[in-house]
Every structure is written in structure tokens, then in C-alpha cells.
């Protein structure tokens, strides 16, 4: 059944696809299908009639052929066989085999029964056996023929029952066969109608093919004519390309033949090349060893350079700290100057107050004449004190100017040192970049050398050139390393000088700071004196205010004047704060105010005669105040000593912390270096892992490839063994001929080897001489390059030194001019102030003479009145 189905499906597909076939081809296909159906029916019939005799099978086959012979003659598609009819009637093919097996069982039992009753029933056995055989194998005989043997069946009931069952099964099988035959006839009718329909379709398709298919083909041909032309052109192009490739193939074959000849020649002369390669490999190994030594030296130099840079950075940070401290001190000095200004303002206010008190005291001048002389003496002493104070102020100003000038000079020196450091740093960076470039060039050369080692069979001369270049570069690097070591020594010396200058600057700073502290102590003592006098004068004024209420109105007016003057002074203070750099104007104002104070003191000397009565009380109070001030001075000295001890302890702590920080920085650098080493080791391990992975993949691929090659070789081995057996016979015949040719060729090869050895020796000698001359030339060239670079660097250094010298000259000229300008301004201001002081002194002397004359007149008048 499977075979018939496949045949039918294949035939239908062929008919559907091959619609445009001719009628003869259709007839041939029909005949093939008919033969296939006949073969399928024969197979099914042979299966159904399994176990039957040859005569019955032949008769059955003839009867079936008579029924289906007319049907199978015109069938195009495969029609159902016996099995197909059984499948339609739901009776499987093994039912017939089952019936045959039952009949065989019955026959065996009958034979056993006959053997038992041979002696007594010979005649009955003959008749029964013949009848049983007829009943078994004649399927179409009626049932009435069994009656003559009823008497014999009564004697064997078992046999009778078995015969009845067998007959009932045979009748049932015959009925099923009849139904199967009717179903098969209906299926035949359906298949015939299907055949007719298919024939009609085939005829209609053939008519369509004859009528419309040529037009459709022509249209398609016209539609795709351009494509066909393009395809033809492409085919021609491909043919031309094929010819071109064939030509290239022939050329490549010729070139391959030449290369093969060269390879054979190189294989013959391989030992010489191997020896040469071994020598070059040894040279390369020595070169790599030297290169590693140079790299170690380079790393050490880099580490030392990093340490020097760190030391420079530390020095720069220290210098910045020193500068910040100096700036803080300057800021504190400015604050002290502002405090002095405030005190001057307070003194001015006191001066105004004293002037008001002098006006009030003028009323009592006539009564107290004797006390005036003592007041004059006190005024003289106060003048002397004022003169000493003014001198002290001038000294302080000079010291402050000197300190500012020194500070500026130190700042300039610091800036110069920083500029020198950055210039040196730039040169070091340039040199480091040059070294890095050279290192990159060395790495590139090494990679090129490795690639050239792989290609030694092709580029032997190039390898020799590159080895010489590497030797030349090595000498260059050695000279550069020497130069770097010299530069390192110079930098170390320069750093030592910088450290010395920094130490000197620190000592100067501490000395100046100590001097400023002493000056501050002196200023504090002067302030205390002024405060004592202020308290004394306040007490006097309070007594005078209590003595006379009349003076209050005048005091209110004076206070209003003071408020106005204070506002004006506040404005002046704002102006002074805006122009702190211009110190000349406040100095002039201070000198004017000092002159005013002196003139007022002279006026006070006239007015202080009334205060002589309270002199004793004041002296006692002054003594008490002096004692208190002495006690306070002792306390302040103790406090100053404690602060100095604390300051020294703080400085010691700072130095200890600095040393600790240096130690920690060193440890941090060591840890960073260890981290870098670990990272480099990690990178190297990663690289080795990747290399091992790649090697593992390649080895696995090679193993698989080797396995496939081994299998292929094992298959070829069998073929080769057969070929070897055949070729051995040929080899024996050809061996004699080849032995003769071998002797001739050996003689030729010996001669050629002698010639090749001679040529190789000559080539080696020439190469040695060439390499020697080349090394000499490169050494001379390297020396010239180093000399040229050194001369160029010296020229550049000379030019830079000249420029620096000219710039320094200009700078110092400008500094001298600036200092001269300041000195000239200061001298002019001092001369003006001296002239003013002299004028004031003359006026004061005149006033004193007038006052003395006035007092003399007063004394003369009183005496006359008394007389």
C-alpha cells in the first residue's frame, strides 16, 4: 500500500508540473502507472494466498485477472488493490491467513484420528479424507455433500464439532469476500469516473497549451528579453574573467614552480642559514639583556626624579607657608597702625577737652602766680617727653619701612626661586618627554625586530641593519643617561641652595618678629603712660566741673564742636582707609596735630597756675598709680614669658608634625610604588592568561584538525597499500635506471656543494667587513649628533642667560629709581616738617618771652600797689 501511494502521489505531481508535455510523453507515463498497479496487485494477491497450493493460487490469480483485466488497461493513476478493499470493508488481510491456519490444525487432528483407527476403519478413513479435502479446498461446494458421512461423524463427535466450526468460519469468510467484492466494484466505478474527469481536464489543458501558451511564452520572452540580454552579457563577462583567471593561474603555477625550486635550493642550503640564524639570535639575546639593564637604569632615574619633584613641591609648600605667615604679620602691623591712629584721635579729643579746660582756668590765672612757674617747668618736661615720643615714632616708622623693604626683597627672592624651579621643571619635563619618545622608538624597534626574526628567510639583510641601529641607539641612551645623572646632581645642588636660602629667610623672619614684639611692648608701655595721664586729667576736670556749674554751658558748646570735629575725623579716617598705601598725608596731619598740641600746652602752662594747690594730692595718687603699674608690669612680663615658652613649644610641635608628615609622605610614595608594581603584575598575569587561552584554543583546533587528518590518512592508507603493491613492481623495474642516474647526480651535487661553500665563505667575509665599516660609520655619526645637540643646547643656554642678565639689569634699575623717588619724597616731607617745627619753636619762644614780660609787669604792679 505504501508503494502504491507513493507512486500515485509522484505521478500526480509530475502531471501537475509537466502540463506542457506532449501526448506521447503522457502515454508513456500512463503505461508506467499501469505496470506499477499490476505489480502492486500481484504483490497483494501473493500475500493473500500465502500458504495455499500452487494450483489453487494460479486459479485464483487467473480469476482475479479476468475480473480486473479490463479495468487496469486504461488507468493513468494507481487504483486500490486487494488490501485497499479489505481496508474499506474493515476486514484486515490477516483474516485469510487465520482461516488457513485453522484448516491446517483440523488436518493435523484428522490425521491423528486416522492413525488411531487405521486398523478398524480403513475404508472410512479413505472416504472421509477425500471428502474432507474436497470440503477444505473447494470453497464454492454446497453443504449437502456432507450427508454420506453422518454415520461416521457420530462415532467421532469431536471431529464433527470442529468441522462445523470450520464450515461456519468458511461461510462467514465467503460472505465477507462477497461484500469486499461489491465494495471493490463500487470503488472501481468511482475511480473510472475520476479517470474520465482527469482525462477531460488533461484534454482541456492540452487545448489551452496549444492555443494560449505560445502567446504567453512570447509575451514573457518580450518582457524578459532585456534581462536575457543582460544575462548573456554577464555570461560573456564571466567567460572573459574565466579566461583571465586561467591566464593568472598559469602564471601563478609558473611562479610556484620557481618558488618551489628556490625552496628546494634553500632546503639544501638550510644548515648554513640555521647557523647564521643561531648567531643572530644570540646577538639579539645579548641585545635584549643590555636593553633590560638600560630599562632598569631608566626606572631608577625616573624614581629619583619623582623623589626630587616631591622634594621641590615640599619646598614650595614651605615657602608658601612662610609667605602666608609674613602676610599675616604685615596685616597685624597694619592693624597696629590703625590702632595708633585711633589713639591719636583720642589724643585730639583730649586736646580739645584740655583747651576747654584751659579757657575755664584763665579766670584764675591772676590769683595763682607762683604756681605758674612750676607749671612752666612741667610744660618743659612734657615738651621734652613729647620730643622723645616723636623721635620714637620716627624711629618706628623707619623700622617699619625697613621691614616692608626687606619683605618685598624676600618676596622677590622667593618669586625668583619659584621661577627658577619652574624653569628647571620645564626642562626636566622636556627631557622626560624626549626619554619617553626614545623609549617608544625603542619599543617600536623591538617589535620590528621580532617581526623581522619571523621573516629571516626573506629579509636577512634588513635584520642586520636594524641590529646596528639598535646598537647605535643604545650608545645614544647611555650618553643620555649620563647626561641625566649629571643633571640630577646639578638639581640636587640647586635644591640644597634653595633649602639654605629658605632657612636664612626663616631666621630673618623670626628675628624681625622678635623685634616687632619688643616694639609692641614699648608701645604698650607708652600707652599705659598716656592712660595714666588721661585718668589724672579726667579727675582734674571732674573736680573743676563740680567746683563750677557755670562752665557747663561752655562745655556743652565745646562738646558740640568736638562732635563736629569727630565727624570730620571719621570722614578723614575713611579717606585714610581707602589710601593706606599713601602714608604721607596722615604723617603730615599727625605733625600738624603735634604742633597744635605743643601750642596748646604752652597756653595750658599759663592756665595751670590754679592747679598747683592740688599738686600734692596728685603726686600721692601718681605714686600709688606707679606702684600699681609696676605690679601690672611684672604680671605682664610673667605672662609674656609664659607666652614665649608656649610659642617655643608650639614651634617644636610644628617641626615634629612636619617631620612626621615627611615620613608619612615617604610611606605613601612607597605604598604607591608597591601598588604600581602590583598593578603591573596583574596586567602581566592577565596578558599571560589571554596568551594561554589563545594557545589552548589553537591547540584544541590543532588537535581536532589532527584527528580529522589522521582519519583521512587512515582512509588513504588502505588505498595507498593497494597502490604500493602495484607500484612495487614498477619500482623494481625503475630502480636500476634510477641508480645509474643517482651516481651521475651525486657527482654534480658534490661539485655544486663545494662551489656553494666557497661562495658562502666569501659572503660571510664580505658581510663581516660591511658590518665593521657600518659600526664605525654609525659611531662617528652618533658622536657628531651628540656634539651638535650639546652645542645647540649651550647656545640656547647662553642666549637665555643673556636675556636674563638684561632683564635683571632693567629690574634693578627700576628698583633703584623707585627707591630714589621714595627717598626724595620722604626728604622733601621731612624738610617741610623740620621747617614747620622750627617756626613753631620760634613762635613758642616769642610767646614765652611775652608771657614772662607779662608776668614781670604783673609782679611789678603788685609790688607798687603794696608799697
Curated annotation (Swiss-Prot):
Keywords: Coiled coil. One of its GO terms (cellular component) is ciliary basal body. It comes from the Eukaryota. InterPro entries: CCDC178. Residues 153-204, 233-414, 445-470, 662-696 form a coiled coil. The keyword Coiled coil applies. This is Coiled-coil domain-containing protein 178. It comes from Homo sapiens (Human).
Amino acid at each position: 500500500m505504501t508503494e502504491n501511494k507513493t507512486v500515485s502521489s509522484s505521478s500526480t505531481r509530475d502531471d501537475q508540473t509537466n502540463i506542457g508535455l506532449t501526448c506521447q510523453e503522457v502515454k508513456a507515463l500512463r503505461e508506467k502507472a499501469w505496470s506499477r498497479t499490476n505489480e502492486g496487485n500481484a504483490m497483494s494477491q501473493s500475500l493473500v494466498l500465502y500458504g495455499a497450493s500452487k494450483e489453487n493460487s494460479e486459479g485464483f490469480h487467473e480469476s482475479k485477472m479476468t475480473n480486473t483485466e479490463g479495468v487496469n488497461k486504461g488507468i493513468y493513476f494507481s487504483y486500490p488493490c486487494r488490501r485497499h478493499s479489505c481496508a474499506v470493508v474493515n476486514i484486515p488481510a490477516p483474516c485469510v491467513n487465520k482461516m488457513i491456519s485453522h484448516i491446517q490444525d483440523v488436518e493435523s487432528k484428522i490425521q491423528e484420528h486416522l492413525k488411531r483407527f487405521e486398523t478398524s476403519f480403513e475404508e472410512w478413513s479413505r472416504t472421509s479424507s477425500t471428502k474432507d479435502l474436497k470440503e477444505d479446498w473447494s470453497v464454492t461446494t454446497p453443504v449437502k455433500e456432507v450427508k454420506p458421512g453422518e454415520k461416521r461423524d457420530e462415532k467421532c463427535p469431536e471431529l464433527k464439532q470442529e468441522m462445523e466450526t470450520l464450515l461456519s468460519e468458511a461461510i462467514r469468510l465467503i460472505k465477507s469476500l462477497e461484500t469486499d467484492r461489491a465494495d471493490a466494484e463500487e470503488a472501481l466505478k468511482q475511480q473510472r469516473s475520476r479517470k474520465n474527469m482527469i482525462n477531460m481536464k488533461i484534454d482541456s489543458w492540452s487545448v489551452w497549451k496549444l492555443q494560449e501558451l505560445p502567446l504567453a511564452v512570447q509575451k514573457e520572452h518580450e518582457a524578459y528579453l532585456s534581462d536575457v540580454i543582460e544575462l548573456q552579457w554577464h555570461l560573456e563577462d564571466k567567460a572573459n574573467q574565466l579566461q583571465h583567471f586561467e591566464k593568472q593561474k598559469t602564471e601563478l603555477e609558473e611562479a610556484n614552480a620557481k618558488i618551489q625550486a628556490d625552496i628546494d635550493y634553500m632546503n639544501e642550503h638550510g644548515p648554513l642559514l640555521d647557523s647564521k640564524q643561531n648567531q643572530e639570535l644570540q646577538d639579539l639575546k645579548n641585545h635584549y639583556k643590555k636593553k633590560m639593564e638600560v630599562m632598569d637604569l631608566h626606572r631608577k632615574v625616573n624614581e629619583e626624579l619623582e623623589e626630587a619633584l616631591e622634594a621641590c613641591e615640599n619646598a614650595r609648600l614651605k615657602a608658601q607657608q612662610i609667605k602666608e605667615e609674613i602676610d599675616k604679620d604685615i596685616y597685624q602691623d597694619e592693624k597696629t597702625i590703625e590702632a595708633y591712629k585711633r589713639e591719636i584721635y583720642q589724643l585730639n579729643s583730649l586736646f580739645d577737652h584740655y583747651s576747654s579746660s584751659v579757657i575755664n582756668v584763665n579766670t584764675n590765672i591772676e590769683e595763682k602766680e607762683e604756681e605758674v612757674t612750676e607749671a612752666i617747668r612741667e610744660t618743659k618736661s612734657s615738651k621734652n617727653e613729647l620730643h622723645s615720643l616723636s623721635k620714637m615714632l620716627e624711629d618706628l616708622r623707619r623700622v617699619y619701612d625697613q621691614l616692608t623693604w626687606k619683605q618685598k626683597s624676600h618676596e622677590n627672592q622667593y618669586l625668583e626661586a619659584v621661577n627658577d624651579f619652574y624653569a628647571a621643571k620645564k626642562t626636566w619635563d622636556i627631557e622626560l618627554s624626549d626619554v619617553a619618545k626614545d623609549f617608544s622608538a625603542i619599543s617600536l624597534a623591538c617589535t620590528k625586530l621580532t617581526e623581522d626574526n619571523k621573516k629571516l628567510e626573506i629579509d636577512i639583510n634588513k635584520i642586520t641593519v636594524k641590529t646596528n641601529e639598535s646598537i647605535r641607539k643604545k650608545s645614544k641612551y647611555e650618553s643620555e643617561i649620563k647626561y641625566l645623572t649629571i643633571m640630577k646632581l646639578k638639581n640636587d645642588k640647586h635644591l640644597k641652595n634653595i633649602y639654605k636660602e629658605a632657612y636664612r629667610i626663616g631666621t630673618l623672619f623670626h628675628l624681625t618678629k622678635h623685634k616687632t614684639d619688643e616694639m609692641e611692648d614699648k608701645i604698650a608701655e607708652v600707652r599705659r603712660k598716656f592712660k595714666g595721664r588721661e585718668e589724672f586729667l579726667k579727675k582734674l576736670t571732674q573736680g573743676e566741673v563740680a567746683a563750677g556749674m557755670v562752665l557747663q554751658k561752655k562745655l556743652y558748646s565745646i562738646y558740640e564742636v568736638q562732635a563736629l570735629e569727630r565727624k570730620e575725623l571719621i570722614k578723614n579716617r575713611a579717606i585714610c582707609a581707602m589710601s593706606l598705601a599713601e602714608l604721607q598725608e596722615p604723617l603730615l596731619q599727625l605733625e600738624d596735630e603735634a604742633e597744635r598740641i605743643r601750642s596748646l600746652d604752652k597756653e595750658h602752662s599759663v592756665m595751670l597756675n590754679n592747679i598747683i594747690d592740688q599738686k600734692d594730692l596728685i603726686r600721692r595718687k601718681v605714686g600709688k598709680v606707679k606702684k600699681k603699674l609696676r605690679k601690672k608690669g611684672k604680671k605682664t612680663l610673667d605672662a609674656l614669658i609664659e607666652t614665649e615658652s608656649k610659642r617655643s613649644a608650639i614651634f617644636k610641635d610644628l617641626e615634629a608634625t612636619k617631620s612626621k608628615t615627611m615620613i608619612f609622605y615617604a610611606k605613601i610614595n612607597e605604598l604607591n610604588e608597591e601598588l604600581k608594581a602590583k598593578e603591573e603584575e596583574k596586567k602581566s598575569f592577565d596578558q599571560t592568561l589571554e596568551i594561554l587561552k589563545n594557545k589552548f584554543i589553537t591547540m584544541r583546533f590543532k588537535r581536532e584538525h589532527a584527528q580529522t587528518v589522521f582519519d583521512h590518512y587512515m582512509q588513504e592508507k588502505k588505498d595507498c597499500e593497494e597502490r604500493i603493491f602495484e607500484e612495487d613492481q614498477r619500482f623494481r623495474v625503475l630502480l636500476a635506471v634510477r641508480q645509474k642516474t643517482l651516481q651521475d647526480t651525486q657527482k654534480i651535487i658534490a661539485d655544486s656543494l663545494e662551489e656553494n661553500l666557497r661562495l658562502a665563505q666569501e659572503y660571510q667575509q664580505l658581510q663581516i667587513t660591511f658590518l665593521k665599516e657600518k659600526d664605525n660609520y654609525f659611531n662617528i655619526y652618533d658622536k657628531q649628533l651628540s656634539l651638535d645637540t650639546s652645542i645647540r643646547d649651550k647656545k640656547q643656554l647662553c642666549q637665555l642667560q643673556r636675556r636674563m642678565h638684561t632683564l635683571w639689569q632693567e629690574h634693578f634699575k627700576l628698583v633703584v629709581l623707585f627707591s630714589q623717588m621714595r627717598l626724595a619724597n620722604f626728604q622733601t616731607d621731612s624738610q617741610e616738617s623740620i621747617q614747620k617745627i622750627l617756626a613753631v619753636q620760634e613762635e613758642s619762644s616769642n610767646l614765652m618771652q611775652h608771657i614772662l614780660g607779662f608776668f614781670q609787669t604783673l609782679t611789678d604792679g603788685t609790688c607798687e600797689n603794696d608799697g
